[in-house]
Amino acid sequence: MFSKVNLNDIQLEGTLHNSGSRKMLVSKDQTTSKYFEAMTYGYIPAGVKYEMHDHTNIIEICIVTKGSGIIRDMEGKTEEYKVGDRFIFPSGIKHEIENNTDKESEFYFIRFQDQ
């Protein structure tokens, strides 16, 4: 049996460090996969930085759908992001996302367990 939900009906919730907001599109308990963790839609307001963080035993895929800015990792690697870019953050790699513009940025985040 399948399930349906309209994304407009999903409530916004805060993110780590209150540096943005997100919608939990699919959570682990809504699937039967032992590796799937979550799929969210994230929002980072203009001029805000999503602070350096990591995901223990979680691989995170980030797809930019709106806006531009900078992504950094703990080793100092810096990449600009723009609409259409895809990033993969391996488990345990600290990273931050900075919206250094005057417009909101939006992303899909997909997370899988590493093991």
Specify the residue positions occupied by each region the protein language model found:
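Short acidic/proline- and small/hydrophobic-mixed sequence motifs that coincide with surface turns
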Residues: 34, 79, 104-106
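Conserved hydrophobic/aromatic beta-strand scaffold that supports enzyme active sites
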Residues: 39-43, 61, 78, 86-88, ...
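Short, charged/polar surface micro-motifs in flexible loops or helix N-caps
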Residues: 32, 45-48, 68-70, 113-115
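A short, N-terminal "cap"/entry segment at the start of jelly-roll beta-barrel domains
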Residues: 1-37, 51
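A generic structural signal for short beta-strands and their flanking turns/coil linkers
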Residues: 21, 35-40, 60, 67, ...
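Ligand-binding loop in jelly-roll beta-barrel domains
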Residues: 91-115
